[in-house]
């Protein structure tokens, strides 16, 4: 498995398997970040999202829909995407750090948790779900 550094990032695929992207940690950022490179687009999420999302999934105790959506689109209730921007999550709002690119939490975080052995993700063409391991 990759080290998750800029030099040795995690190489991941979206849950449907249609797109590839990389992620790595930037612990020197303020706040510490996960850097997600999708083609020429860079997205950033709070590093603590890994532990926080895993804890929330464990609380749910079952499969949770991913519900990936862009920042400007509403997220369906009860989805990973909705939790990643909810005022009721541990950071009180968005885990995404780059304005205009804060969405897609439900697309890019689940495969990382699966890679790290923290979650199981379905890999269907649409309507994917995840659960904690």
Where are these regions (language model features)?
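Short helix-coil junctions and helix-kink-helix linkers
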Residues: 77-79, 84-104
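Charged, low-complexity intrinsically disordered segments and flexible loops
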Residues: 30-33, 93-94, 131-133
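Long, low-complexity, charged/polar intrinsically disordered regions in eukaryotic proteins
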Residues: 2-75
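Short, hydrophobic-biased segments on the C-terminal half of alpha helices
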Residues: 107-111
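Intrinsically disordered, low-complexity segments enriched in small/polar residues
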Residues: 19-22, 43, 93, 99, ...
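Solvent-exposed, non-transmembrane amphipathic alpha-helical segments
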Residues: 70-73, 77, 129, 133
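A short, conserved structural fragment
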Residues: 114-128
């Amino acid at each position: 498995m990759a080290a998750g550094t800029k030099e040795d990032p995690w190489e991941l695929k979206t849950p449907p398997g249609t797109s590839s992207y990389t992620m790595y940690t930037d612990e020197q950022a303020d706040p510490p970040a996960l850097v997600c490179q999708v083609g020429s687009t860079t997205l950033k999420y709070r590093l603590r999202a890994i532990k926080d999302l895993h804890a929330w999934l464990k609380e749910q105790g079952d499969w949770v829909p991913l519900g990936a959506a862009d920042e400007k689109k509403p997220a369906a209730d009860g989805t990973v995407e909705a939790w990643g921007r909810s005022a009721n999550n541990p950071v009180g709002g968005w885990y995404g750090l780059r304005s205009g690119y804060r969405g897609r939490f439900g697309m890019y975080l689940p495969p990382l948790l699966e890679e790290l052995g923290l979650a199981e993700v379905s890999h269907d063409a649409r309507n994917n779900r995840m659960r904690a391991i």
